[in-house]
């Protein structure tokens, strides 16, 4: 029986690349995508003629629940903090009548791990603390629910715990994604791109405080490979491992930090500055130290992105899915990222 997949966020950067990777690998899937824009729906179908459009938004909760109930695999690539929509998807999967397990794959960032820095108002400082998604998972899940994303995450994990014979779940926490997307969005506005934009518009690079905070990152196509591997595993409805450290799906496992590198924000600022100078876009190589409040005024939430530590280590994808990232490191993509931001600013 052909598996039915329902996806939200398919016109975005992460979701768009994942759908491209999935249908390139397995065009036989029956994929339905929630899309609110008629123009984007037309463009998505033009790229993927087999995709069925579900016209609606994340606020159409009954629509989401019904779509999930009629699917085998639900992929939430949309708003990670929109708890009502995630809960509706979970509720729909819990009542589905199709044979086999229903699967819910939820995407979010790794920003929940900045809790200590935020509470202590510690910005731009180094932290030795590194979270991992296998042996360290209990510690990860014990981080207080201060972030809006935690509510949606808990809704995902709860439906799997309460319905173990019917629903399996995976939470995919991505590092800062970079690289050219193959969906409708080639490059998204991320904290990395915002740092480049501010560097070009101000004529010099900047960092928060001492610039020693660090964040993990991941090449977009390597990230999509994780989604394809999860969906393939779900399609086969394979038996999950009883070993918590190797389990693919929720309960005691099913939690993934997906990353293939780390950037220290001050070091990244220097690399951006060097690239911008090399392209003749700025004159000097000075790096300005700013405080968290100014960072927030320059780019939304970038006081947290540029100033806090989200140091995580992904182990589960390699163990449970045999995932091996092969994409170029972030520094190799800076030339193109700087060029793209310069074009947006009319500098090239």
UniProtKB/Swiss-Prot annotation:
InterPro entries: NAD(P)-bd_dom (IPR016040), NAD(P)-bd_dom_sf (IPR036291), NAD(P)-dependent_oxidoreduct (IPR051783). One of its GO terms (molecular function) is aldehyde dehydrogenase (NAD+) activity. Disruption phenotype: Leads to the accumulation of a shunt product in which a double bond is introduced between C5 and C6, thereby scrambling the existing stereochemistry at both positions. Pathway: Mycotoxin biosynthesis. Transmembrane segments: none annotated. It holds the Pfam family NAD_binding_10. Oxidase; part of the gene cluster that mediates the biosynthesis of UCS1025A, a member of the pyrrolizidinone family that acts as a strong telomerase inhibitor and displays potent antibacterial and antitumor properties. These compounds share a hemiaminal-containing pyrrolizidinone core fused with a gamma-lactone, giving a furopyrrolizidine that is connected to a decalin fragment. The polyketide synthase module (PKS) of the PKS-NRPS ucsA is responsible for the synthesis of the polyketide backbone via the condensation of an acetyl-CoA starter unit with 6 malonyl-CoA units. Belongs to the avfA family. This is Oxidase ucsJ. The lineage of its organism: Eukaryota, Fungi, Dikarya, Ascomycota, Pezizomycotina.
């Amino acid at each position: 029986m052909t598996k039915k997949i329902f996806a939200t966020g398919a016109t975005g950067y992460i979701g768009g690349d994942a759908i491209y990777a999935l249908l390139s690998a397995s065009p036989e899937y029956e994929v339905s995508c929630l899309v609110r824009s008629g123009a984007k729906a037309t463009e998505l179908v033009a790229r993927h003629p087999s995709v069925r459009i579900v016209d609606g938004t994340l606020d159409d909760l009954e629509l989401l629940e019904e779509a999930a109930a009629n699917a085998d695999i639900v992929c939430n690539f949309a708003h990670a903090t929109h708890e009502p929509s995630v809960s509706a998807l979970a509720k729909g999967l819990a009542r589905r009548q199709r044979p086999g397990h229903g699967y819910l794959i939820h995407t979010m960032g790794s920003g929940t791990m900045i809790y200590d820095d935020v509470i202590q108002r510690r910005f731009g400082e180094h932290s030795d603390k590194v979270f991992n998604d296998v042996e360290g998972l209990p510690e990860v899940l014990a981080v207080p629910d201060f972030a809006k994303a935690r509510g949606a995450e808990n809704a995902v994990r709860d439906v799997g715990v309460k319905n173990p014979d019917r629903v399996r779940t995976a939470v995919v926490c991505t590092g800062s994604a970079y690289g050219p997307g193959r969906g409708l969005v080639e490059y998204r506005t991320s904290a990395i791109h915002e740092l480049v934009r501010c560097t070009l518009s101000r004529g010099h690079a900047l960092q928060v405080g001492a610039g020693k905070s660090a964040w993990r990152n991941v090449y977009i196509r390597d990230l999509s490979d994780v989604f394809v591997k999860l969906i393939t595993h779900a399609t086969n409805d394979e038996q999950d491992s009883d070993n918590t450290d190797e389990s693919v799906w929720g309960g005691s496992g099913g939690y993934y930090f997906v990353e293939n590198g780390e950037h220290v924000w001050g070091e990244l600022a220097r690399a951006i500055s060097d690239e911008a100078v090399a392209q003749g876009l700025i004159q000097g190589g000075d790096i300005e130290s700013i405080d968290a409040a100014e960072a927030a005024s320059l780019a939304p939430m970038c006081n947290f992105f540029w100033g806090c530590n989200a140091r995580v280590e992904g182990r589960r994808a390699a163990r449970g899915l045999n995932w091996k990232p092969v994409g170029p490191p972030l520094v190799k993509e800076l030339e193109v990222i700087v060029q793209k931001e310069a074009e947006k600013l009319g500098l090239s």
